[in-house]
UniProtKB/Swiss-Prot annotation:
Quaternary structure and partners: Monomer in solution. Exhibits a doughnut-like shape with a central, shallow depression and has a diameter of 8 nm.
Name of the gene this protein is made from: dtpD
Transmembrane segments: 14-34, 49-69, 78-98, 101-121, 138-158, 167-187, 212-232, 235-255, 269-289, 312-332, 344-364, 379-399, 413-433, 462-482
Pfam families membership: PTR2
Residue ranges, Cytoplasmic side: 1-13, 70-77, 122-137, 188-211, 256-268, 333-343, 400-412, 483-493
Gene Ontology CC entries for this record: plasma membrane
Family label: Belongs to the major facilitator superfamily. Proton-dependent oligopeptide transporter (POT/PTR) (TC 2.A.17) family. DtpD subfamily.
The protein's name in its UniProt record: Dipeptide permease D
Organism of origin: Escherichia coli O157:H7
Cited PANTHER family: PROTON-DEPENDENT OLIGOPEPTIDE FAMILY TRANSPORT PROTEIN, RESISTANCE PROTEIN MDTM, PUTATIVE-RELATED-RELATED
Topology versus the membrane: Multi-pass membrane protein
Length: 493
């Protein structure tokens, strides 16, 4: 059989694991901001701070996770350990109604599991292809889109469980999903024998005071404890600063050690893509915070006599990603003609443009709410769907470029740095942006009145901010296109 005729068989086990990881992560994420404000009665500012701290630290730990996978564990073992930790974290989160301390501990455990899982699952997928394999981009688009099956089901299932039963039941479903994904992945273990395994030589060398696996176990226990303190003391911003400095230092070291100009050029492209990804996700991550509270407070959620739980709206974005992702992976064929860098920047411009359009629709929705008291459901659905479509032109493109780099032994670390900037820093910025909507007053009875004008202003500013990014990216695209054209003309002459 032609090796380029179809996707590798192992990809379907990775996709299955990704589906259930998305179910687990996004099921919990859909509930978290609502849990903090509606159940624990945090004010908006406090809720945004904890939510953005959690989402930021979730993307800090992939640097350590990528390092452990590159040097010790291998991508396969790192992914399995990460999935197990996330399942444990969701179980503990379900008990946070018993005592508030469980909230911080559970978020810390999930953060550690996510760090081992997130960057390394992409690298594991990259190991299934040769660097020049044309199926690579399609494989990443397929994984990204298929993973959103879990994102679609999770807010519906977890939102329904929370609404009809309890918050603990909603969070418990997220844990069940992660365990299911891990079991399926283990069933396909034989298809990953050619991927990198545990580096036993390194393990044997780390036996000072403790046996081989001792230090790894200490790390798995000590890291959640440390992150729990960061949440409790609200020191996460300091951890973010330290992680960013370390990440940029590692990136500079990789750049200096690059063997030729081609490798340095690839690194510069990755850095620039990461910057615009960071801005994109600072806008997109409003979906789990300010947009979620906007829907809860200002959108008419009645449909055929049933009030749709707010958490279920998180499925709209994922549904758009899945449908459009399958279309891009299997219907739209990637052209091998032309310059790859030019195509990359064209996709980024389209993604940022769609994000701007999505927030333009949300601005109209908020203005509708200001005039009539509540916004219409179809307008909200359209805005979230457009924003979901935009995602397909950002992360899959950047991740594919990272795994394509020809510097050995750095893909895990580079992916971790990408997650740090486009995830951790972006989520911190998203929290700062979301906090601009936390304007409220109290009436004579003591009830809280939330300001719709704050949402209008923030959504409108994001619309124009994303549009400005499109302008810059289009200039880069034009520069690269002209450069490629001039080079082609020079070769012809």
């Amino acid at each position: 059989m032609n090796k380029h005729a179809s996707q590798p068989r192992a990809i379907y086990y990775v996709v299955a694991l990704q589906i259930w990881e998305y179910f687990s992560f996004y099921g919990m994420r859909a509930l978290l901001i609502l849990y903090l404000t509606n159940q624990l009665k945090y004010n908006d500012t406090h809720a945004y701070e904890l939510f953005s701290a959690y989402c930021s630290l979730v993307y800090v730990t992939p640097i350590l996770g990528g390092f452990l996978a590159d040097k010790v564990l291998g991508n396969r073992m790192a992914v399995m350990l990460g999935a197990l930790l996330m399942a444990i974290g969701h179980v503990v989160l379900g008990a946070s109604e018993i005592h508030p301390s469980f909230l911080y501990l559970s978020l810390a455990i999930i953060v550690c599991g996510y760090g081992l899982f997130k960057s390394n699952v992409s690298c594991l997928l990259g190991e299934l292809y040769e660097p020049t394999d044309p199926r690579r981009d399609g494989g990443f688009s397929l994984m990204y889109a298929a993973g959103n099956v879990g994102s679609i089901i999770a807010p519906i299932a977890c939102g329904y469980a929370q609404e009809e039963y309890s918050w603990a039941m909603g969070f418990g479903l997220a844990a069940v999903g992660m365990i299911a994904g891990l079991v399926i992945f283990l069933c396909g273990n034989r298809h990953f024998t050619h991927t990198r395994g545990v580096n036993k030589k390194v393990l044997r060398a780390t036996n000072f005071l403790l046996p081989n696996w001792g230090w790894l176990l200490v790390l798995l226990v000590a890291t959640p404890a440390l992150i729990t303190v960061l949440f409790w003391k609200e020191w996460s911003v300091y951890a973010l600063i330290v992680a960013t400095i370390i990440g940029l230092g590692v990136l500079a070291k990789i750049y200096r050690k690059a063997e030729n100009q081609k490798q340095r050029k690839e690194l510069r492209l990755i850095v620039t893509l990461t910057f615009f990804s960071m801005l994109f996700w600072a806008f997109a991550q409003q979906g789990g915070s300010s947009i979620s509270l906007y829907i809860d407070r200002f959108v008419n959620r009645d449909m055929f006599g049933y009030t749709v739980p707010t958490a279920m709206f998180q499925s709209i974005n994922a549904f758009a990603v899945m449908l459009c992702g399958v279309f891009l992976a299997w219907v739209v064929k990637e052209s091998v003609a032309g310059n790859r860098t030019v195509r990359i920047w064209g996709k980024f411009a389209l993604g940022l443009g769609l994000m701007s359009a999505g927030f333009c629709i949300l601005t109209l929705s908020a203005r509708w709410s200001a005039m009539y008291g509540h916004s219409s459901l179809p307008l909200m659905v359209l805005g979230l769907a457009v924003m979901g479509f935009a995602e397909l032109f950002i992360d899959p493109v950047a991740m594919s470029q990272i795994t394509r780099i020809e510097i050995p032994g750095v893909t895990g670390v580079l992916t971790g740095i990408y997650m740090l900037l486009s995830g951790a820093i972006a989520n911190y910025l998203a929290g700062v942006i979301a906090d601009q909507t936390s304007q409220a007053s109290f009436d004579a009875s003591g009830a809280i009145n939330y300001s719709i004008n704050a949402y209008i202003e923030v959504f409108d500013q994001i619309t124009w901010g994303a549009l400005a990014c499109v302008g810059v990216v289009l200039m880069i695209w034009l520069y690269q296109a002209l450069k490629f054209r001039n080079r082609a003309l020079a070769l012809e002459s």
